Amino acid sequence: MRHRFVVPSALVLVALLSAGPGQAYNGGPMRNVTDLTPTCAGCHSSVGKEQLRLEPDTLAASMLVENRHYEPIEEGTGPYKDMSPADRQKLLADVKLMDQSASATLSAPPTLKPGQEAQITATVRGGHGVVGVWVMESDLRLQGRPISADGWFIVGAPKVWGADGKEQTKWVDGRGAGLKKNLNAVLIFDQKADLAARKFPEGKVTWTVQAPHAPGTYTLAVAFHYGTEKASSVGTVTTVAGAILPKGGPGGPSGHILFSKPITVTVR
């Protein structure tokens, strides 16, 4: 017997509030040009249980992609209720392919001296449209923090490259005049997946950092936020205003969160 996990109403409210008017993560958190963690993306689906390992079982289950996103498509509930069985089957297959093809890795020197300057680089693959990359001190979705909370200092603006190999500054250029741009979070724009050809966009972000001054072993991970439905030929809906949204809606579960495997850096 299958057990359906229902997202508590309080979580739905958080998702809608964090989404902002009509956009959610559909076009990225464009107004939040600041340090970010995945807690701001309340409507997203989690890819993998490990990022929710400290949460109560019921809450964790409600956030997993299998229950939050796959199941409503498969059963034809919510925003998917008017889709034909054939279209739902295609959308589900396309979304699963997006997840199977998504990846995120993080690299950094294994050993640093206190305060030593170094570079850490995130490489991501997958998603469609705008994707988000946050560097964090753990791989916890709800309790992870920016690396600055663990003593790291980001030196200057992160360097961002999109699928075309060209450097992007759109995200950091959106920072308010006079504000520092040493952010832990970036958006990568114009990423396009071709499901028919099984081609998926890649992106790269490099942060120049100073190591913590306190000796010890530090954990680093990257949270990769990406959309899935808009890459599918049956995965969009057009509003009366002409906006193209995911089939699941702007505050729906089609945005997914994937963490890289954590790495450790020893400061000594």
Model-derived regions: residue spans:
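Bacterial N-terminal signal peptides that target proteins for export
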Residues: 1-9
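Bacterial N-terminal signal peptides
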Residues: 9-18
